[in-house]
């Protein structure tokens, strides 16, 4: 689903706390989250530049100051996740993090891989290149970074602990689950045959299966039914996001879709 960037306000959604220090401040189709580390905010995937004014307002609604954003972390470099980064960095000067193999998309060396159609991408040079096994640490946050290529070559998945009322749970986000970049048309148009995108995606599913996740954090709202769970929380279900079974079910569905794609759209 592509967003209508000429009418971003039509996507507005109330911000809310998911669990502990993790908050949703974004919209659809892609998600934006913040983590209050106690020593500053970490924002994951600031989204489209056209949506940034609403993201900043949502951060304020939750009682935080956007100027306290210290780190801007990206799951991958596509426009719907990183389009606002240039403007946000110019505004607050936060440090940017991105998987090393996606930095050439962000900085404009491979502009055709941004998945932007006819939309504009303000390129930027990420400050910190993320590699497999790296940790992003700030205050009470210790976020493990796992390379999970396929959707893009530099896709990064994130896993970290969240504590609330003395209870610590494991949160996890798969950095790129979309199949749009796995189609034969996309691969042939961009001459990506040598990269074995589908093989990489398969290995990334297997890698993510090794992780236990109590709180599945989607980088698109449809992955974990973000808004449905928000509504259940507002109706009184305080543990709407606390379902460890969601993660393996999500990964199994990705595997089924990949198997179907290999049959219906061979390379």
Located regions from the model:
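Mobile, glycine- and charge-enriched loop segments
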Residues: 130-131, 149-198, 264-266
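Active-site HxH/HxHxD metal-binding segment of metal-dependent hydrolases
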Residues: 22, 50-53, 60-135, 235-236, ...
């Amino acid at each position: 689903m592509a967003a209508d960037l000429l009418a971003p306000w039509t996507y507005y959604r109330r911000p809310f706390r998911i669990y502990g220090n993790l908050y949703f401040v974004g919209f659809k189709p892609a998600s934006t989250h913040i983590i209050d580390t106690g020593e500053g905010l970490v924002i994951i995937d600031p989204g489209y530049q056209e949506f940034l004014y609403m993201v900043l307002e949502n951060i304020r609604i939750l009682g935080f100051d956007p100027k306290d954003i210290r780190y801007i972390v990206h799951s991958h470099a596509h426009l719907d996740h990183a389009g606002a980064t240039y403007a946000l960095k110019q505004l607050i000067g936060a440090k940017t993090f991105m998987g090393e193999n996606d930095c050439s998309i962000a900085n404009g060396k491979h502009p055709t891989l941004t998945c932007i159609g006819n939309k504009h991408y303000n390129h930027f040079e990420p400050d910190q290149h993320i590699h497999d096994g790296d940790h992003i640490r700030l205050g009470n946050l210790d976020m493990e970074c796992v390379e999970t290529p396929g959707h893009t070559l530099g896709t990064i998945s994130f896993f970290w602990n969240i504590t609330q009322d003395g209870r610590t749970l494991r949160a996890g986000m798969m950095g790129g689950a979309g199949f749009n970049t796995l189609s034969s048309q996309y691969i042939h148009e961009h001459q990506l045959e040598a990269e074995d995108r589908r093989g990489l995606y398969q290995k990334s599913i297997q890698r993510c299966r090794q992780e236990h996740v109590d709180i599945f954090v989607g980088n698109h709202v449809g992955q974990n039914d973000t808004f449905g769970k928000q509504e259940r929380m507002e109706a009184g279900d305080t543990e709407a996001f606390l379902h460890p079974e969601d993660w393996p079910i999500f990964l199994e569905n990705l595997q089924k879709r990949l198997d179907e794609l290999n049959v219906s759209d061979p390379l």
